[in-house]
Amino acid sequence: MGQKINPLGFRLGTTQSHHSLWFAQPKKYSEGLEEDKKIRDCIKNYVQKNIRISSGMEGIARIEIQKRIDLIQIIIYMGFPKLLIEDKPRRVEELQMNVQKELNCVNRKLNIAITRISNPYGDPNILAEFIAGQLKNRVSFRKAMKKAIELTEQANTKGIQVQIAGRIDGKEIARVEWIREGRVPLQTIEAKIDYCSYTVRTIYGVLGIKIWIFVDEE
C-alpha cells in the first residue's frame, strides 16, 4: 500500500512555513514545545467556551507563535474575527490574561494579535469544523461533503479532496468515503497544499475528517 506522508511536513521549507518561530537549547527544547501546546490549547478552549457561532464553529485557521527573550508574540488567524473582536479589547485582554496565567510567565511580555483570513472556507481547518457541525446535526455525509466543496469553489481554490472515515451514518462496519474536485497533486512539492485532519464525536462514535486543498502552484 502507498505510504501517505503528511502534506504539510513534506513541504516545510518550500511552500509551507513553520507555525512556531523560536530558538532553544537542546535541553530546553521540550519545554518550549510544551509551552506552545499550552498556548494553543488555552486559546482554543477560550474560544470554544465563549465564542461559538450558531453553526458551532470556532473559526480558527491557525495560531502562530514567535518567541524572543522578553516577548511572546501570538498571531491568531481567524475566518470570523468578529466573534473575538465584538467587545474588543475586553475579550482579547481576558484571553491574554488566561494565557499568561496558564504559562505563568513573569519576566516575559505576552502580545496577542488577531488577523482575518480573506477566504475562510478556503482553509481546511474551518472547512473541517463546518463538516463536523453538519455531521453532528445528522446531515448525510454526502450532502455535507458536497456543501463543503461548493463553499471552497467560491474561495477560488484549484482543487479539494475530502475524506471521512469511521461509522458513517451509524453503519455497523466502519468505512472510508472520499470525494475529489479539481486537481490535488500530492506528489508535487512545489504545489501549495493545505491539509487538516479533524476528529468529530457523533452519537455513533468518532469520525475522522481529512481535507486537502490545492491552493496554488509556486
Curated annotation (Swiss-Prot):
One of its GO terms (cellular component) is ribosome. The gene is rps3. HAMAP family: Ribosomal_uS3_B. Keywords: Chloroplast, Plastid, Ribonucleoprotein, Ribosomal protein, RNA-binding, rRNA-binding. Its main location: plastid. It is found in: Plastid, Chloroplast. This is Small ribosomal subunit protein uS3c. CDD domains: KH-II_30S_S3 (cd02412). Pfam families: Ribosomal_S3_C. Residues 47-118 form the KH type-2 domain. One of its GO terms (biological process) is translation. Coiled coil: none annotated. GO terms for molecular function: mRNA binding; rRNA binding; structural constituent of ribosome. Belongs to the universal ribosomal protein uS3 family. PROSITE patterns: KH_TYPE_2, RIBOSOMAL_S3. InterPro entries: KH_dom-like_a/b (IPR015946), KH_dom_type_2 (IPR004044), KH_sf_prok-type (IPR009019), Ribosomal_S3_C_sf (IPR036419), Ribosomal_uS3_bac-typ (IPR005704), Ribosomal_uS3_C (IPR001351), Ribosomal_uS3_CS (IPR018280). Part of the 30S ribosomal subunit. The keyword rRNA-binding applies.
